Regions:
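Core catalytic ATP-binding domain of two-component histidine kinases
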Residues: 1-206, 211-215
């Protein structure tokens, strides 16, 4: 009975979180502005993994994840970033299913590590799959609005993901993985800058609105 209650509570939490994600995406599409706050990276990853696992199990895909220890917080709309991660993990699972990989080679890996880009500290999120990879012509057009590798759907998923990342002053990219000439999968990654320290934020505000001086 206790196990059943725990399972029901988990299901209720997942349903509530899914509802929050849908509402935030609607708000973002209308305003194109994220609700950025100090966000804990491991918590975001945990929430995204919990929701994505449902879809990955449906495709018989194993999900593993690694989060580096003691990651600083990022300034982010956690619900939107969770949705980016969920989309990338689900896309990976669908690519694996399309490639008809054997059960021993059906995995998606999420890794979150610190990374510096052009001298700026940040956090890199990467989702790697063992799917069929992306043809070059698809890579070139991947983030165009309405372009899709799927036979159905509007193709807004990756375009929306990139818009969300870029609205956080981040960047997103995709690359195929190879074993010799053979494509063994694909890796999507995006980078977010760290939250500025409190003093830096105060300095920025002060510089944006300098005090008036009497002439």
């Amino acid at each position: 009975e206790e196990a059943l209650l725990t399972a029901l509570e988990k299901t209720a939490h997942q349903a509530q979180r899914a509802g929050q994600i849908i509402q935030r995406i609607r708000d973002f599409v209308k305003k194109s502005a994220p609700n950025r706050q100090l966000a804990d990276v491991p918590t975001m990853v945990s929430e995204a993994v919990e929701l994505a696992e449902i879809e990955l199990r449906r495709h018989n895909v194993r999900l593993t994840h690694y989060v580096a220890a003691r990651l600083p917080q990022v300034m982010a709309d956690s619900i939107l970033i969770e949705q980016v991660l969920i989309n990338l993990m689900k896309n990976g699972a669908e690519s694996i299913a399309q490639a008809q990989r054997p059960l021993s080679n059906r995995s998606v890996e999420l890794r979150v590590v610190p990374r510096q880009v052009e001298g700026q500290d940040g956090v890199e999120f990467s989702v790697q799959d063992t799917g069929k990879g992306l043809p070059q012509e698809v890579q070139d057009r991947l983030f165009e609005a309405f372009f899709s590798t799927k036979t159905e759907g509007m193709g807004m998923g990756l375009t929306l993901c990139r818009s969300i990342v870029e609205s956080h002053q981040g960047r997103m990219q995709a690359e195929n993985l190879y074993n010799g000439p053979e494509v063994t999968g694909c890796r999507f990654s995006f980078w977010l800058p760290l939250a500025a320290p409190a003093n830096d934020t105060a300095d920025t505000v002060a510089n944006a609105h300098p005090p008036r001086t009497n002439a």
